Amino acid sequence: MSASLFWKCSCPRRITLCPHWRPCQRLRVSLRHAPHLKRCAATLRVAAGSHDVPLAWPGLAHFLEHLLFLGTERFPVEQGLMAYVRAQGGQLNARTCERATEFFFELPASAFAGGLERLCEMLAQPRMSLEDQHREREVLHAEFIAWSRDATAQRQFALFDGLHAAHPLRAFHAGNRYSLNLPNNAFQQALQQFHREYYQAGQMVLSLAGPQPLEELRALAERYGSCLPSGQHLEQTAPPALMTTGNQTYQQLSGQRLDLLFALERLPAGATAAVDFLCTWLQSAKPGGLLAELQQRQLAHSLKATLLYEFAGQALLHLEFDLTSVAASAPVQVRELLTEWLGFFSAQADWAPLREEYVLLQQRQIEVASALELSRRDSRQAADGLDESGLAALKQVLKQLQPQAVEHFSHDWRLPPANPFLRSTIEAPRAGLIRGQTSAHRGLRTFAQDRSRGRKESSALSFSQALPADPSGSALTLRWQLASPAPMGLHARLLRSLATLRDDARQAGVELIFTSCGKDWLLKLHGLPSPMPAVLLQALKALGRPAESFWQEQASVNAEAPLLTIRQLLKAFSEQPQPDSPAQPDPEALQALWASARWDGLGLALPAAIQEALSRTLQQMPGTADATLCRPVPAGTGQQWQNLPGSAGEHALLLFYPVPSASLADEAAWRLLGQLCQTPFYQRLRVELQLGYGVFSAVRQRNGRTGLLFGVQSPGATVTEILQHIAQFLEHLPEQLQALDEPSWNDQQQALAQQLQPATLPLDQAMELLWQAKLAGHSSDYLPQLQGCIEALTPAIVIQAARQLREAAGGCSALANRPCPGTPWQVAE
């Protein structure tokens, strides 16, 4: 029996609910029409997760999520959703949570129907052969080993130690070789029953978001959603109490990290929005708030408030503090101030100003969200504000957090002021005085001086016309090339000083990123263009001349938990860290660094008025404008090996093979080669050889050079063995490509060419492509030229590129957590 559907349709400024709503019998469908989107996304959320499986089979839900990607009779794995999305340049993932499992992907509109068809097919008709199960169980076991060795994951799991032992949050749910007893008939029956009971329409929500009209989205949902099995909605079993000791809070202290956890029970509808509302203001660093007072008293550097868990009226609130010292009195003082602030916050009358601000924050997040983010948001039925039910839930949350009223306050608490970037933009100031002038000399400043500086800045900052101006999304990248190494830890301190500004900018729809890449410092802004000049102005002030308090602050010594090894390697590959100067950072050292630095930049899709405002703002830019910074990096040769220190753990390796030349024809061939590599590389090393779950290949660009990046993290294979497996794969790659039929070639070639069309190219991808093209010295029509080169490719050209790859014709760079294995590899200088 096929599924029937009920609808929730939304488009800008209009939400309508269709009348036929039978949640106990029908697939729930949410549709969002957003004309500014360049891509489409689908999220299918199943109301069943790790806590819903039989106690005898921990990990079964996560295991099933993996199995569903292994193909169906109609779409075998090489034609399934994962391979299809990769070939179309999209993205996909899945996530098994405590009480839900999500499957989601994003694709160009032209390929969206094929993705939705494969998604619904794989959930409704999985193959789940025993052979597939054995292979995938080993992948899960590798994941489990990595999880058990990952400090961040273990620290997160340990947060639940204070809960009632019978609560499922305390249990093991990851799944491994021993908990997934495949030969046992009882396990196989449980697996089939879990899929049959929960993977049916009554237990699902399908959310679609894209630029198509609602009628088109609805037709897609009807066509492909109807293939899902029909069924009744099942009530999930309510868990036991989070805590049974009477005290609903506990703390954990490790070094300078303080974790406070609060168990909340019997919460009404609207609790998720209520806790999010509370967390928004609780962790605000604005003057008069809790974090500002903690920083003022030098008790804590940072505060992060998170809802760790929410289901059936239960919630677990987590407050993470980065303390400034290990003094025994610090946690006590932090809790006392928290109690005061909660008392102050609870005493407010319905929080009208903050509720208005919160609505604006939610609206702004919707404005700048991608199709994938919108579909995931809609699948969770996230609130757009704090309505009356949310207000009632907030009062209940605060009552449980702060049972007794606070009568006397030791501090003059204040509600956070409005975000300055949300309601209006700040006019960038005109040029100030020349060094040495006073206000009395202002009339003596010549327009020629202003124009001269402006011309230099304008020539150093170029505005690409590759994408049209877009009031819904623009990008700006600024680069400083440092003449000498920065003083020790200076970049990290500057980055921390931008934290409050980054939060305000993000709330206003602008992502602000300050990072390093080799000898360069990069400042990137991405999102709504209207707040960008004001955000940039504040960033340049903070970076160019930090406040006196910046130099007086005690540096945070609470080290971040290490990333997974493969992620450490990827971070190092991107940032190319350089040794700092041993000099201590001080105001004089910073000004000397800026005085010798040169800068340039690139803007994309910026409206003319914003370009003008940014040009004025850049008069505050430290360093010297220089339009000649981009010099193409010469093609390399040889095989260089770099060992990343301090990244011990599972064996992990990245191999980067640059294109042998700077010609766009060669780049086009290698880009198509990279697309053709993805699925067979993953299939060979992850599925067949079962090296581990951290297996990928992709086209990457670094320092203006395009190449193919291969990555593997394995709990069993050594780095030398991983090298051998990759070499064997590359050895047979030309033969594999020769076996492809003509339709497969044409489909892949057409898909790659379409990904570069301005109408469908996402802003962040376009910006990265154009920035790397600038570094490589390509002309302004790089994108159409590259697209033309891709369309002109023949199989013979790509197969020749595969032979070049096999021979490392453009050289090869290895980044690993093990020493150089010797010839033909050389230790990188």
From Swiss-Prot:
An example molecular function term from Gene Ontology annotations: zinc ion binding
Q: Does the keyword field hold Nucleotide-binding?
A: no
List of catalytic residues: 65 (proton acceptor)
What are the annotated GO cellular component locations? cytoplasm
Q: Which GO terms describe its biological process?
A: proteolysis; pyrroloquinoline quinone biosynthetic process
- Domain of life, per UniProt, equals Bacteria
- Functional pathway: Cofactor biosynthesis; pyrroloquinoline quinone biosynthesis
Residue ranges annotated as coiled coil are none
Q: What InterPro entries does its record include? A: Metalloenz_LuxS/M16 (IPR011249), Pept_M16_N (IPR011765), Pept_M16_Zn_BS (IPR001431), Peptidase_M16 (IPR050626), Peptidase_M16_C (IPR007863), PQQ_synth_PqqF (IPR011844), PqqF-like_C_4 (IPR054734), PqqF_C_3 (IPR054733)
What's the record's note on cofactor binding? Binds 1 zinc ion per subunit.
Membrane spanning stretches: none
The cofactor(s) it depends on are: Zn(2+)
**Chain residues that bind Zn(2+):** 62, 66, 143
Q: Keywords on this record?
A: Hydrolase, Metal-binding, Metalloprotease, PQQ biosynthesis, Protease, Zinc
Stated EC number for the protein is 3.4.24.-
Described purpose of this protein according to its UniProt entry: Required for coenzyme pyrroloquinoline quinone (PQQ) biosynthesis. It is thought that this protein is a protease that cleaves peptides bond in a small peptide (gene pqqA), providing the glutamate and tyrosine residues which are necessary for the synthesis of PQQ.
Family assignment?
A: Belongs to the peptidase M16 family.
PANTHER family given in the database record? INSULIN-DEGRADING ENZYME-RELATED, NARDILYSIN
Provide the protein name: Coenzyme PQQ synthesis protein F
